[in-house]
């Protein structure tokens, strides 16, 4: 989780409260104080609150929580008259772009550091180390709009930030510290993204490094901000950055993004979205009945706007664009509880006393872990959310109708709940190619089939001599330890080599499968060694 260093002078100025009061109250909004020093305080926030990754965001939240300034923050956005054109080929490289101009900023060394820290924390929290989102911040003094976002040849030359001589883009990836660190994002691409001005001067080589021409100094007053990436998180990151700058007196101006087909998108869009939350959700989740005025007051303290709809049973809530964590009504209810104060919600003793014991599924899970570890396998715990590409396309399988999909996915990597575990294990192999072979992994975890949770055990092994006999011996050991009689029956599955795949039957019913992965599947995951694996259902 990100640890934010907040300078007291900055914090007191932006919050309009003294440091002792802030230190006393800041844990109540979901922060852990890591360190208190003479000039600054280090605070750790949960990753789901990227709007609190800066002193400006913390100050905004604290002003509301302490009743200094409540309700929705209104950030005025005026048209700049500036536009940026997208090249046709950029959609194959890094297709999503959001831009803004912020003018009239009075920078100090500490405010520049705060902005750069926010930028890097967003790269981590929202951007998956710049893969999904990367942010460029530019001094506008030496550049002339309109701008262009294009895909160019890797031999294009420019002077990157912190260097004095021109380098090709390939050289940047090989020699510049940022290039070396993030080169994997552009691996395999024939063209690289580039942002230039009307005179061809380079602003940015996203997601790697800015050009040296637009370095931000204390004398900088006007900024051009570009955010590139792969999805809607781009626009959230842009909102967080420009709202932080507006907290320091910056004036936000919009930029028109012009796509190759002539369509246009004006960014940033700071228009709040609306959620309707039933009173029944609030009452049942918090456990106490608050009045309408109390609910609205707590929402305003948490920097929302709210009103009661005519039927009296529904609250209409305006959510600011920088709140990336508000995905469901439950998130709103949580903020109401935070605003009200968990210390005010009294706990109750249970009406009856019982003696607990481990659930049979938990016992099975523990036993299977012990068995697999004793067989030389390492346990992993990947996400249960995955994508159709990994789960079906890369496994050479047709999409089935027993899948549970995510209604509004925020990432193309997490669009469905897995129905099997093996694709996750193979994906981990692809991420661990820098480790020596053999690698043997297992997971005892949940899958969802036909909207029902099932507990599965999956194991996989990768090395040059991996074969059906090896994985059969592992399965034999597992079943022997559990005193389960089973049989295997040859079956077909496009993910496995024909004749080297079998169903696992217990009492005549299929409980799993095993086999050698088909070479094309192995290649789909970017691997080059044989893989064998099995997966069984432990639910019954």
From Swiss-Prot:
CDD domains in alphabetical order: PheRS_beta_core
Broad enzyme group: ligase
Catalytic activity: tRNA(Phe) + L-phenylalanine + ATP = L-phenylalanyl-tRNA(Phe) + AMP + diphosphate + H(+)
Binding site for Mg(2+): 325, 331, 334-335
Localization terms from the record: Cytoplasm
Entry EC number(s): 6.1.1.20
Entries under InterPro entries matching the protein: aa-tRNA-synth_II/BPL/LPL, B3/B4_tRNA-bd, DNA-bd_dom_put_sf, Phe-tRNA-ligase_IIc_bsu, Phe-tRNA-synth_IIc_bsu_arc_euk, Phe-tRNA_synthase-like_B3/B4, Phe_tRNA_ligase_beta2_arc, PheRS_beta_core
Domain B5 positions: 270-347
Pfam families in alphabetical order: B3_4, B5, tRNA_synthFbeta
A Gene Ontology cellular-component term: phenylalanine-tRNA ligase complex
GO biological process terms on file: phenylalanyl-tRNA aminoacylation
One GO molecular-function entry: phenylalanine-tRNA ligase activity
Keywords, alphabetical: Aminoacyl-tRNA synthetase, ATP-binding, Cytoplasm, Ligase, Magnesium, Metal-binding, Nucleotide-binding, Protein biosynthesis
SMART domains referenced in this protein's UniProt entry, alphabetically: B3_4, B5
Entry cofactors: Mg(2+)
Family the entry assigns: Belongs to the phenylalanyl-tRNA synthetase beta subunit family. Type 2 subfamily.
Assembly and binders: Tetramer of two alpha and two beta subunits.
Name assigned to this protein: Phenylalanine--tRNA ligase beta subunit
Organism: Methanococcoides burtonii (strain DSM 6242 / NBRC 107633 / OCM 468 / ACE-M)
Lineage: Archaea, Methanobacteriati, Methanobacteriota, Stenosarchaea group, Methanomicrobia
Record gene name: pheT
């Amino acid at each position: 989780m990100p640890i934010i260093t907040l300078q007291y002078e900055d914090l007191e100025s932006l919050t309009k409260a003294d440091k002792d009061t802030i230190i006393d109250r800041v844990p109540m909004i979901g922060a852990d104080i890591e360190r208190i020093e003479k000039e600054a305080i280090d605070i750790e926030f949960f990753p789901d609150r990227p709007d609190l990754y800066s002193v400006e965001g913390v100050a905004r939240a604290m002003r509301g929580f302490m009743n200094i300034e409540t309700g929705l923050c209104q950030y005025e956005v005026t048209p700049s008259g500036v536009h940026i054109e997208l090249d046709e080929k950029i959609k194959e490289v890094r297709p999503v772009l959001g831009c803004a101009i912020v003018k009239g900023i009075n920078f100090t060394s500490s405010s520049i550091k705060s902005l750069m820290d926010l930028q890097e924390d967003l790269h981590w929290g929202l951007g998956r180390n710049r893969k999904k989102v990367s942010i460029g911040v530019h001094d506008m003094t030496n550049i002339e709009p309109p701008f262009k976002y294009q895909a160019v040849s890797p031999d294009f030359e420019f002077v990157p930030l912190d260097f004095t001589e021109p380098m090709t883009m390939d050289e940047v990836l090989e020699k510049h510290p940022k290039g070396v660190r993030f080169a994997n994002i552009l691996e395999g691409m024939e063209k690289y993204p580039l942002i230039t001005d009307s005179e061809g001067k380079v602003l940015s080589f996203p997601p790697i490094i800015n050009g040296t021409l637009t370095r931000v100094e204390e004398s900088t007053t006007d900024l051009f901000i570009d955010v590139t990436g792969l999805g809607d998180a781009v626009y959230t990151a842009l909102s967080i950055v420009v709202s932080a700058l507006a907290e320091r007196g910056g004036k936000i101006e919009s930029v028109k993004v012009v796509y190759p087909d002539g369509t246009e998108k004006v960014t940033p869009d700071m228009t709040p979205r609306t959620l309707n939350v039933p009173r029944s959700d609030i009452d049942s989740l918090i456990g106490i009945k608050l009045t309408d005025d109390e609910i609205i007051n707590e929402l305003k303290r948490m920097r929302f706007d709210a009103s009661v709809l005519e039927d009296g049973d529904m609250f209409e809530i305006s959510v600011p664009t920088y709140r990336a964590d508000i995905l469901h009504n439950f998130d709103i209810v949580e903020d109401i509880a935070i605003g009200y104060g968990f210390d005010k919600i009294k706990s109750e003793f249970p009406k009856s006393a019982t003696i607990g014991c481990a659930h049979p599924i938990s016992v099975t899970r523990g036993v299977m872990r012990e068995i697999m570890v004793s067989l030389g396998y390492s346990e992993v715990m990947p996400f249960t959310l995955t994508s159709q590409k990994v789960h079906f396309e890369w496994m050479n399988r047709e999409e089935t109708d027993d899948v549970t999909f995510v209604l509004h996915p925020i990432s193309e990597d997490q669009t469905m709940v897995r129905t099997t575990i093996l694709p996750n294990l193979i994906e981990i192999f692809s991420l661990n190619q820098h480790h020596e072979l053999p690698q043997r992994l297992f997971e005892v975890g949940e899958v969802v089939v036909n909207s029902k949770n099932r507990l599965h055990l999956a194991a996989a092994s990768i090395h040059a001599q991996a074969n059906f006999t090896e994985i059969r011996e592992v399965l034999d050991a597992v079943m022997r330890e559990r005193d389960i009689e089973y049989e295997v029956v040859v079956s077909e599955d496009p993910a496995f080599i024909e004749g080297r795949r079998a169903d696992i039957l217990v009492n005549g019913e299929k409980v799993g499968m095993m086999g050698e992965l088909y070479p094309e599947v192995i290649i789909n995951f970017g691997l080059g060694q044989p893989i064998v694996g099995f997966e069984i259902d432990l639910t019954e």
